[in-house]
A protein has these predicted regions:
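Glycan-recognition and catalytic cores of secretory/periplasmic carbohydrate-active enzymes
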Residues: 1-2, 6-286
Length: 286
């Protein structure tokens, strides 16, 4: 849920003019506010975040209207003694990104979102621990470092506070080459946001630019470091299960990173001996 709020907000920060031209800005703001409000209400103290309602295994065995549900409404939460840095940091990222969306439209609400985001990030970082509350159903397989970097990048973008960039720079050893961007693995998103800052002159973020390039190379047919296959029709084939969610999120990264490179005057991405132009990168999405 928090990841969805993050991506909807990212779409607005990058494509507000286009969304507005399609008369969808009000709708997407309403969706973001709905999700953000839920996260705000779930954040009941500086070190308490309610993370889930219900037993996922039981719920998935019975598809029905919420009004008819009689499965257990078990509550899960994270605290300082039972941490879950992944979910706290992702909630921080979501609220920071949403605060940008409402900065002009509703400045008081934007400030509130940012305050909670900072508290959640501090909670996630100070009480580091992997979220195991409802495993084996909703587990973190990538660890919590990706969410901490992702949240720090959004907090910098929302606040302009250089301490968040310094956090990312001092923890660049966490950054990994990946071929997936998903609700569980945020490295490619963090790398894309931080690569933009590198291209604007923040040279201590060079590893994130390398990571963002690596993500492109992992997806591009003909790349020497290709990791993702395509279907006969050209669709990225990342996972056997629920593939389109990974295709959609990967496509978003490729589009936004292409936009970032164009703005920085960079013509493409070098993958081994082969150079992929911005046009070629975008063609994989057609």
């Amino acid at each position: 849920m928090a990841f969805s709020v993050s991506l909807l907000s990212w779409a607005v920060t990058e494509y507000q003019t286009e969304i507005s031209a399609a008369n969808q800005l009000g709708h997407i703001r309403s969706a973001i506010r709905w999700g953000a409000e839920y996260l705000l209400r779930a954040h009941t103290s500086s070190t308490t975040l309610y993370t889930q309602v219900g037993d996922a295994n039981r719920d998935h065995q019975c598809w029905e209207r919420p009004e008819d549900m009689d499965t257990p409404r078990t509550l899960y939460k994270i605290t300082s003694s039972s941490p879950g840095s992944e979910v706290a940091a992702e909630a921080a990222a979501a609220l920071a990104a949403a605060s940008i969306v409402f900065k002009v439209a509703d400045s008081k609400y934007s400030d509130r979102l940012l305050r909670h985001s900072k508290l959640l990030f501090e909670f996630a970082d100070k009480f580091r621990g992997s979220y195991q509350g409802s495993c084996p159903f909703y587990c973190s397989y990538s660890g919590y470092q990706d969410e901490l970097l992702w949240a720090a990048a959004w907090l910098y973008k929302a606040s302009g506070d250089n301490s968040y960039l310094n956090y990312a720079a001092s923890n660049d050893g966490w950054s990994q080459a990946v071929s997936e961007f998903s609700w569980d693995n945020k490295f490619a998103g963090a790398q894309t946001l931080l690569a933009k800052e590198f291209l604007k002159g923040k040279t201590n973020l060079a590893k994130y630019k390398t990571g963002a390039d690596s993500f492109v190379c992992a997806l591009m047919p003909g790349s020497s470091s290709l990791q993702i296959k395509t279907t006969p029709g050209g669709l990225l084939y990342i996972r056997d299960s629920s593939n389109l969610q990974y295709v959609t999120s990967s496509s978003m990264i490729l589009l936004i990173y292409s936009k970032i490179l164009i703005s920085a005057g960079v013509r493409g991405v070098q993958c081994g001996s082969k150079d992929f132009s911005i046009t070629t990168i975008k063609e994989i999405l057609e």
